[in-house]
């Protein structure tokens, strides 16, 4: 039982005994005692002044005396104005540590068959280019969010919608057809997504050259864009694709398959995956159908040019296009189609979309539309909106080929981690295979942690060099501390020390040890908070705080050299439980922790 729960129950009993009043649990407010005061937990007594009919200090004094006499968890108390600071007994902290120790997955709540089903969409790549730094933030946030939502007792389905059709895909296809000379991933030794991305860049270069030529002949930019033969060919290819032209469809399938093989490799390296992948080419027709259904029911209206719109002025928004006059769909139509397929596949209770903040308006509209069309989760859909990510050099663009590819970034992170680890002697005495594995764990851990520690809503600059520092709020610092604890546990085992299932009470704990148990115990509340706020950064920053506190403890106290055997065993057990919570916390973020370094 949590210490707070015990104290709340005792305070309720005390108020009844002292003042003859029953109070609800929510009226009893406990918080961590501020660092400048003595104690662990503080009770705010102001809500009880009416019933005590006394001043705040006297009321606090009376409640404190009652708790000291009747609640074994309270060892001492002091009163500062209307605040009652409670010092918790050492035996109670050891009891709490035993509870944590007995649960291998402390702080995580298992789902049952009847738990709510939450679907989380993330990644959403286009099949005309490789994944880039923006996708890295999206994938890492989506994967961590899925883990956190699952750790709060929900069933989770991780899903991806692949944008595999449209004019941007036709640009890569046309460029390959015109300039590719039959190149394949096999013939070039390139990953398929990178090869197709090269042709997207190639289209853009040829198109720009064409525009420059037409403008030299006296055309305006708009006229040149309308007259561009290359763009006309791309549009014709899209029309043929929509009409199911066998040659265009065969080229589309071949190039998309190259891209999927490349994506799979990137996802595998990144450590993310999906339970179900949807493709826009399968969903856009479903969306059209649903829009026509809404038109018949009078939810939507048609303009003279045949386009279909929805009027959202009553909801404080404007008119929104759902189908163009020529019958082609827009993103909104496709999202409606995808929702229809998903709802047919799964009994969704909640849908979370992990999409950048430039789409905030889109999801406001989508929520209203899905609700109008009868999707039960429409109104409550969650747009997990996140900010842009940049490198210190500035923004990224993919049309000009100056984008930061996810593959290159991950490779650079692993090689930098290897160099840094070697310089600091972290790889000494390891085989080549072990050293490579640690470089991978540290490099990817640095990347993931640096991105996930930032509040998702904020724009951020990813600094590769800063992220691989073994000191400060970084992945490698946390990983190194975990490896350090594993080394302590190995040495303890080698010297024949066995951690008992129950650590016996009877030892006096220092303030630092009590604080560390309190921090480890907080993990359960942190996981809950991260789930309620949809915030991986809460887990990341808590894990850093825990590791920072443990490192101070490690420097200030003897563990293996402690002479008192009972204290030594307690400190080893405390270390093991810190390591467990670090492993669980980093696991929720999708980050591995090495057992040696």
UniProtKB/Swiss-Prot annotation:
Gene Ontology annotations for the cellular component aspect, listed alphabetically: cytoplasm
Location within or outside the cell: Cytoplasm
EC number(s) stated in the UniProt entry for this protein: 6.1.1.19
InterPro entries per the UniProt record, alphabetical: aa-tRNA-synth_I_CS (IPR001412), Arg-tRNA-ligase (IPR001278), Arg-tRNA-synth_N (IPR005148), Arg-tRNA-synth_N_sf (IPR036695), ArgRS_core (IPR035684), DALR_anticod-bd (IPR008909), Rossmann-like_a/b/a_fold (IPR014729), tRNAsynth_Ia_anticodon-bd (IPR009080)
Enzyme class (EC, first level): ligase
Locus of motif 'HIGH' region: 125-135
Keywords, in A-Z order: Aminoacyl-tRNA synthetase, ATP-binding, Cytoplasm, Ligase, Nucleotide-binding, Protein biosynthesis
BP GO annotations: arginyl-tRNA aminoacylation
Membrane-crossing residue ranges in chain numbering: none
Name of one Pfam family that matches: tRNA-synt_1d
Domain of life: Bacteria
Record field: catalytic activity: tRNA(Arg) + L-arginine + ATP = L-arginyl-tRNA(Arg) + AMP + diphosphate
Keyword Ligase attributed: yes
A GO MF term: ATP binding
Signal peptide (from-to): none
Principal place of residence: cytoplasm
Quaternary structure note: Monomer.
Family: Belongs to the class-I aminoacyl-tRNA synthetase family.
NCBIfam families, A to Z: argS (TIGR00456)
Protein name: Arginine--tRNA ligase
Lineage: Bacteria, Pseudomonadati, Bacteroidota, Bacteroidia, Bacteroidales
